[in-house]
A protein has these predicted regions:
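Short acidic, low-complexity intrinsically disordered linear motifs used
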Residues: 1-13
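Helical scaffold of the NTase/Pol beta-like nucleotidyltransferase catalytic core
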Residues: 10-67
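Well-ordered, non-membrane alpha-helical segments in soluble/globular domains
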Residues: 41-51, 91-97, 160-171
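Intrinsically disordered, low-complexity eukaryotic regions enriched in glycine, serine
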Residues: 53-57, 85, 106-113, 282, ...
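Short secondary-structure junctions
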Residues: 57-67, 94-115, 180-189
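Conserved catalytic core of two-metal-ion nucleotidyltransferases
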Residues: 98-148
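Catalytic cores of NTP-dependent nucleotidyl/adenyl transfer enzymes across multiple folds
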Residues: 126-294
Length: 295
């Protein structure tokens, strides 16, 4: 799942765009940013042997820390893995990644990216329009694995018609419409001088913030930017998140469909309309297409 697609902002952009390079399968250099060249999708049957081989080379458990839809659908475009490392340990991890026999070119931005040969690659396992090269991109994402599994969760393709991004946009839409407290004073463009609200954050979870317009450096009015100041402890456990959102349990957060069902049970009338309008207007939803259930 690409975080840029989740909230319509770009807090941790994982869809790394940059100049495509000719595939490099010799040498292992560390570069900054950019998607890996020469990679393609991996079949679900190839994921475990590919990661098992890389686990032996890195001395790390990888299979238990995959994120998003990996292993939940027949083909995955790449593999995202959470790594629980302190900031001071990342440089050594980068060196270890470069030295691993399987890794090809290694790139680093907010995550470590590499390509590896797919173990047990079967070129006959494919479908129309799918790129299969025998190599797959693996992104290593530093952070708390437990929380990242919650945030980057994607439902199994048999359980939902929609990607995990829709789930997160729905959570964000609900959060943005509950317990909003807006001050009476407004600035020239009509925005409130201060408001308190909940937001769905890729780093903090569900958290209540005080939102204020950002002052101009010269002191004359405000910019279009905003300043969010946390005023509560973050909520990261699924049951706690669901409770604060006015839903029943963490199971309601499983997919877009379960969230929509829970929303209709917990809210009525204008509140549902506001939440669904916010969801529909999200740029990622506009780009992918509004779900049939609410179109």
């Amino acid at each position: 799942m690409k975080v840029k697609d989740i909230l319509g902002s770009n807090p941790l952009n994982k869809r790394h765009r940059g100049p495509h390079r000719k595939p490099r399968y010799r040498g292992r250099d560390l570069h900054e940013g950019g998607a890996m060249a020469g990679v393609g999708a991996i079949h679900i049957s190839e994921i475990e042997p590919t990661l098992r081989k890389l686990e032996k080379e890195l001395g790390l458990n990888l299979r238990d820390f995959t994120l998003g839809s990996v292993g939940k659908k027949e083909f995955s475009g790449d593999i995202d893995i959470a790594i629980n490392l302190k900031p001071e340990e990342l440089a050594d991890f980068g060196k270890k990644l470069q030295a691993a026999p399987s890794t090809q070119e290694v790139k680093k931005s907010s995550v470590f990216m590499t390509s590896v040969p797919i173990v047990g690659y079967d070129e006959n396992k494919t479908r129309d329009g799918l790129t299969r090269t025998g190599y797959v991109q693996i992104d290593f994402m530093p952070g708390d694995p437990g929380w990242m599994k919650t945030y980057y969760h994607a439902p199994h393709e048999k359980d939902s018609k929609y990607k995990g991004v829709f789930r997160n946009i729905m959570i964000a839409s609900i959060a943005g419409r509950i317990d909003v407290v807006v001050g009476d004073e407004k600035i020239e463009d009509g925005r409130p001088l201060v408001q308190e609200r909940w937001i769905w954050s890729p780093t903090d979870g569900l958290i209540r913030i005080k939102r204020e317009p950002k002052p101009r450096k010269d002191g004359n009015g405000y910019t279009k930017a905003k300043v969010d100041t946390p005023i509560s402890n973050p909520i990261r456990d699924p049951d706690g998140i669901a409770k604060q959102l006015g839903l029943t349990s963490g199971k309601d957060l499983y997919s877009f469909e379960t969230l929509l069902s829970a929303l209709k049970k917990s809210y009525k009338g204008e509140k549902i309309k506001q939440i669904l309008d916010d969801f529909r207007s999200n740029y990622a939803v506009q780009d992918i297409g509004v779900p049939d259930e609410i179109s």
